[in-house]
């Protein structure tokens, strides 16, 4: 997802809320250029967009997978920041591991973000009618 820094972040939050509502929080993984900064996702500072997003994520029980790194998710001639987020719901929280910002060169001013996903297997227990 892309959150345009020229638009109100609340509009983007509404989009995420719709995704969460329609998915019923099952198996959602969102990779987003949020154009929002927060120390919660290991940026050097928190801006107003970041504060709004922090409150939303806390209230909706969605989780940020970003971890501390010597690399940043965004860099250009003006500086560096961590504005790209990987977000998930409680169901997938333990299934996504090895989150890392790659130091591999690419043509974008955004870094490559890598992670591993372990499949979630639903266990179905059927009642055996012979045990009654």
Which residue stretches match the model-derived regions?
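A shared catalytic/ligand-binding motif for oxyanion handling
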Residues: 1-132
């Amino acid at each position: 997802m892309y959150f345009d820094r020229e638009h109100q972040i609340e509009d983007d939050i509404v989009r995420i809320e719709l995704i969460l509502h329609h998915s019923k929080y099952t198996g959602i993984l969102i990779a987003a250029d949020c154009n929002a900064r927060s120390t919660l996702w290991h940026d050097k500072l928190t801006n107003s967009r970041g504060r709004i997003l922090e409150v939303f994520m806390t209230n909706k029980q969605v989780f940020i997978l970003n971890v501390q790194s010597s690399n940043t998710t965004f860099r250009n001639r003006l500086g560096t920041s961590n504005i790209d987020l990987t977000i998930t719901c409680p169901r997938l929280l333990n299934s996504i591991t090895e989150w890392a910002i790659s130091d591999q060169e690419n043509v974008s001013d955004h870094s490559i973000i890598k992670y591993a996903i372990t499949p979630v297997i639903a266990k179905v227990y059927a009642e055996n009618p012979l045990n009654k």
